[in-house]
Design a protein with these regions (language model features):
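Short beta-strand segments
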Residues: 113, 147, 155-158, 203-205, ...
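Well-ordered secondary-structure scaffolds
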Residues: 5, 9, 14, 19-21, ...
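Glycine/serine-rich anion-binding loops at beta->alpha junctions
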Residues: 81-104, 108-120
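Alpha-helix C-terminal capping segments
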Residues: 51, 98-111, 191-196, 231-232, ...
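A glycine-rich helix N-cap at a beta->alpha junction
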Residues: 127-153, 223-229, 233
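Short acidic, glycine/serine/threonine-rich loops at helix termini
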Residues: 96, 114, 121-126, 157-158, ...
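Phosphate/diphosphate-binding glycine-rich loops and adjacent basic-rich segments that engage nucleotide
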Residues: 148-197
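Acidic, glycine/proline-rich low-complexity segments that act as flexible tails and inter-domain linkers
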Residues: 1-92, 309-313, 425-431
Length: 431
């Protein structure tokens, strides 16, 4: 039996910089999920949390209350250890696509519950839905069957998983409270803990194209999430990784699937390969699998075999031709020299404006829309050489996409100190 409180007294407590008690948190999450606390009241509480923060105990209890609002998944029937990865998202971040089958090829089970894109960051499900026939929505029984048969599954979270978070996420989006670290951490971790994985690697992006552009804030978020995972009995660590430049050479849906398949075939851009292998090593070690060689599994075709099985098991055709946008245009370099910088946010916004992303939940995306990137920082370019190829089904979108790409690159002489950019791995966080 959950003790009853007044929403107003809980709002006032946080407004006045007090810590909320466990019973207060349990009640307000339960009551809001049931509709007994109004959106206006929860909006006020969320803003008070954003302004005044939460102690670790409060964040942990808030997370537990969201988990307890729904079901908890159980993978005890599997013969393999379970491990998952969560990325906070960015531009060209297609890492989940090659990573899940790679880790499965090395002996772990990967129950990857993914989401859709919003704004400039792409969604894993949107990318995979560009494969003809592929299904994002699976029942728990179907998920288990795919995991048993293939070792990896990538699908949407069911309605029964942390339903409190679904309501809170939608409310945060329209009340300017998205940025609150306690709310970000509890939103991510409530779903991941309820998912039932025994180990979790967090990929927290930072830099211009990331949700947490400030590295100090990204590290703070990573520490909070690692603590939440460990307190819940999930083996958890985080890598803070660079998102100042787009990952790989594509931003879009079908474009990123093609690039992921190149990686699984033993090729692909070096930054995608490096980060995929590093994350696979962390996941396998955390899952207790010794002696695995993910780099070899990419080269020898084992990861590709799992990919093909996984796509087929979810109704997709791994050999089907991927959608191609009807129109394209090329953006060229205005001068010659070294490409010194590329703004990931501007590239992501351009891809969104071309139709690769959405501005509201539920909006359709164009499978073939997006951007191919022909040069990255450190490359030598000549005036008139292609920098980007833009793809869309709606030619009118080119104008606004080109506006987004204005001043997205800097071209000049290579400084003696080299290019100033974030290392791919900014920090590894274990507590």
């Amino acid at each position: 039996m959950i003790e009853a409180f007044s929403a107003a007294e809980i709002i006032a407590a946080k407004r006045d910089h007090h810590s909320l008690t466990d019973p207060q948190i349990d009640w307000v999450i339960d009551a809001y999920t049931r509709g007994a606390v109004a959106d206006e009241q929860m909006s006020a509480l969320l803003m008070a949390i954003l302004l005044n923060g939460m102690e670790n105990r409060e964040i942990s209890r808030w997370t537990d209350a969201m988990i307890n609002s729904g079901e908890r998944m159980n993978w005890s029937a599997l013969s393999r250890p379970t491990v998952d990865k969560h990325s906070t998202g960015g531009v060209g971040d297609k890492i989940t696509l090659p990573l899940a089958p790679l880790v499965a090829a090395c002996g772990a089970a990967v129950p990857q519950l993914s989401g859709r894109g919003l704004g400039h960051t792409g969604g894993t499900l949107d990318k995979l839905e560009s494969i003809p026939g592929w299904r994002a929505s699976l029942s728990n029984e179907e998920m288990l069957k795919v995991l048993q048969d293939c070792g990896a599954v990538i699908c949407a979270a069911g309605a029964g998983l942390a339903p409190a978070d679904k309501k809170l996420y939608a409310l945060r989006d329209v009340t300017a409270t998205v940025e609150a670290i306690p709310l970000i951490a509890s939103s991510i971790m409530s779903k991941k803990i309820a998912e039932g994985t025994s180990a979790l690697v967090l990929d927290v992006k930072t830099g211009a194209g990331a949700f947490m552009s400030d590295p100090a804030k990204a590290k703070e978020l990573a520490h909070v999430m690692v603590g939440l995972g460990k307190r819940a009995g999930v083996k958890t660590l985080a890598l803070v990784t660079a998102m100042d430049v787009p990952l790989g050479l594509t931003a879009g849906n079908a474009l990123e699937v093609r690039e992921s398949v190149e990686v699984l075939a033993g090729g692909g851009p070096s930054d995608i390969v490096e980060l995929t292998v590093l994350l696979a090593q962390e996941m396998l070690e955390l899952a207790g699998i010794k002696g695995a060689d993910p780099a070899a599994a990419l080269k020898n075709g084992k990861a590709m075999d799992v990919w093909r099985q996984m796509i087929s098991a979810q109704g997709g055709d791994p050999d089907a031709k991927l959608p191609v946008a009807r129109e394209n245009t090329v953006v060229t370099a205005q001068s010659s020299g070294t490409l010194l910088s590329m703004d990931a946010m501007k590239v992501g916004m351009a891809a969104w404006r071309l139709g690769a992303g959405r501005s509201r939940q539920g909006e359709a995306v164009q499978a073939g829309a997006g951007i191919e990137i022909h040069a990255k920082p450190g490359d030598t370019v000549t005036a008139g050489a292609p920098l980007y190829t833009l793809h869309t089904d709606t030619p009118a979108a080119f104008t606004r996409a080109l506006e987004s790409l204005e001043d997205s690159v800097t071209i000049g002489e290579m400084p003696a100190s080299g290019i100033d950019r974030l290392p791919l791995i900014v920090e590894r966080i274990v507590d």
